[in-house]
Amino acid sequence: MGSDKRVSRTERSGRYGSIIDRDDRDERESRSRRRDSDYKRSSDDRRGDRYDDYRDYDSPERERERRNSDRSEDGYHSDGDYGEHDYRHDISDERESKTIMLRGLPITITESDIREMMESFEGPQPADVRLMKRKTGVSRGFAFVEFYHLQDATSWMEANQKKLVIQGKHIAMHYSNPRPKFEDWLCNKCCLNNFRKRLKCFRCGADKFDSEQEVPPGTTESAQSVDYYCDTIILRNIAPHTVVDSIMTALSPYASLAVNNIRLIKDKQTQQNRGFAFVQLSSAMDASQLLQILQSLHPPLKIDGKTIGVDFAKSARKDLVLPDGNRVSAFSVASTAIAAAQWSSTQSQSGEGGSVDYSYMQPGQDGYTQYTQYSQDYQQFYQQQAGGLESDTSATSGTTVTTTSAAVVSQSPQLYNQTSNPPGSPTEEAQPSTSTSTQAPAASPTGVVPGTKYAVPDTSTYQYDESSGYYYDPTTGLYYDPNSQYYYNSLTQQYLYWDGEKETYVPAAEASSNQQTGLPSTKEGKEKKEKPKSKTAQQIAKDMERWAKSLNKQKENFKNSFQPVNSLREEERRESAAADAGFALFEKKGALAERQQLLPELVRNGDEENPLKRGLVAAYSGDSDNEEELVERLESEEEKLADWKKMACLLCRRQFPNRDALVRHQQLSDLHKQNMDIYRRSRLSEQELEALELREREMKYRDRAAERREKYGIPEPPEPKRKKQFDAGTVNYEQPTKDGIDHSNIGNKMLQAMGWREGSGLGRKCQGITAPIEAQVRLKGAGLGAKGSAYGLSGADSYKDAVRKAMFARFTEME
């Protein structure tokens, strides 16, 4: 009993509790926190094991979208975009990174406020600003500011001393570092991220031990961190009213894009931009090259006054993921593919005030040997791919342009990185001469011997010659023109081009002769393919010829009939000139595509003059010659229907005094038109008549309502509905005091019981009122003692009594 310490009532039920209770409560809270953390860690492990089988097929972007379904105001920032960053701050473990974390932000602040504040400062501008929000849309009080480079982030932190003042509140800035991913390992064969518990690669079955052994020490984190690698990049912070043309104009110095390469995301309701756009290129290599160019710009890229953030568009495909080591080699191979596009854009990008200088890897630099090896592999691959393709010829200029296999120019979006020189640089292209500058060494005395096999030309080793404007090849002594892709031999004064099949330089004269002769087998194949096309082209040319002749004949007849107005004469002249020009064009040109483009316009003009011919052309197909024969036969027969000697119309059986009257009859008479229509229909077959009637039915509008009115007549309009009017019935209400107050009321009986008699006043000495109190109507807005506030009206008075009393009161006031 002595050892037991009893707790008093005061200690047990005090206001703040006893000290023992507080100690026990603190210990219980610490145990619960440890238990929660252990449970969270174990649940994470169980969740990782549970989704082991299909997590490999999902990208981190989808996982973040599942975890964070809310979006910010722009529509493309989610709360989970920085889910892999460490939010906890430890000054001792802080490392520099290009992402800065802002803590302690006001709840009412938005991303636009942070972005405007950042842009107001001088110095490097951020690439992206993301405010972290809860699922309800309320700010969590911190944001991430991402810069393009690490140097920009460090200089920003040093300039602001790791502190900012936003809306009068001091904000602390810290570097945000990604959490280390020790649980994942990267397969070196298929570049797939696998969980730490998986001993073999999920895709290719490679051993985990082999992948860990190949990773050099000290690069574990860099090898395990995987970036996205695809052919599409995303442009962020797009203005709400930016159009696709503005994006193409901003990216034109760095890439050759088409409208279908850019996808601008808009809101379905407001039709305004949601703040981001996608740019898809021909390959992932081109996308990585463009991304490097845009991220290295100083100042950063701006579109419509907005600083644009650039990054890879995160795809759901795991095949596009490459480690850092493999990406370096891919960039080296991509540089060779982009070289051809850089040459082709020289003239279009160079202006009058400056020239374009392209920088290539020169001998002696780091990685030049590896760069050359990848270039040769890339060129050999495309030589094999392009070996069976034929070179296209230009039909308009007449010159033959051959595409070299060494410099493959793709029709997909092309990349070119250029550096403009000062305005004082020479821009005119001079004729190449034997004397070279210091940058181009002297040509070899032997020169290029036709027929000798040479190595594939490497455009990266060429040196720019300022005196001639060409690029000099030190291995062969030739000058290279990037615009025409021809080589110039200064010794023989001859132009050459590279033939990938023969692996030699061929003179341009031989190329034209070879192009004209061609191979018999190829020629026969082309003739077989072009037979139906040439037949269709001949038919179109014949149609044009007939149309031109008919239009000119109508013009002559119209001139002979009478003198028209000047405007009509000019219009006829333009139509005839258009017909002649169209016919001449179709006689000269052999391309079917151009004929199909010009034919509808010319036929449309001719249809106004000859509606029946338009129906005939629509009824027949252009592949048969029966149509041509039929039209020619009808025209010849129609010409015989007029006797120009007797000045008579044989169809209508009428004779006219002169030629002008006969022409006017043919052009303006309704009778002649009806007879001509009947005559033409009689010459057509049943199938042709059905086709003509079908077209007339389609062209003519049938007014069914008018036909119905003619058949049944117009019905009489219905009588308008009258609204039913109900007379409000009189309501009999109770009027007990209309004839005065009698003795039977309760008040009278009570007063009589207290000693009051009728006719005497109230009070002890009967000095009070003798008449009962009546309700009087008072003027609205007037006080109780105001003059004229009451006219002696009561609630039982009629309108006539009220007017009479009011008039009497005004009369007494005047007195």
Swiss-Prot record:
Residues 743-789 form the G-patch domain. Keywords: Apoptosis, Metal-binding, mRNA processing, mRNA splicing, Nucleus, Phosphoprotein, Repeat, RNA-binding, Spliceosome, Zinc, Zinc-finger. One of its GO terms (molecular function) is zinc ion binding. A zinc finger (C2H2-type) spans 647-672. Residues 393-410, 426-446 have a biased composition (Low complexity). The keyword Transport does not apply. Residues 321-809 are annotated as: Required for interaction with U2AF2. The modification Phosphoserine is found at residues 18, 59, 69, 72, 78, 444, 621, 624. One of its GO terms (biological process) is positive regulation of apoptotic process. A zinc finger (RanBP2-type) spans 181-210. Residues 98-178, 231-315 form the RRM domain. Coiled coil: none annotated. InterPro entries: G_patch_dom (IPR000467), Nucleotide-bd_a/b_plait_sf (IPR012677), OCRE (IPR041591), RBD_domain_sf (IPR035979), RBM5_RRM1 (IPR034991), RBM5_RRM2 (IPR034993), RRM_dom (IPR000504), Znf_C2H2_type (IPR013087). GO terms for cellular component: cytosol; nucleoplasm; nucleus; spliceosomal complex. Belongs to the RBM5/RBM10 family. PANTHER family: RNA-BINDING PROTEIN (PTHR13948), RNA-BINDING PROTEIN 5 (PTHR13948:SF21). This is RNA-binding protein 5. It comes from Mus musculus (Mouse).
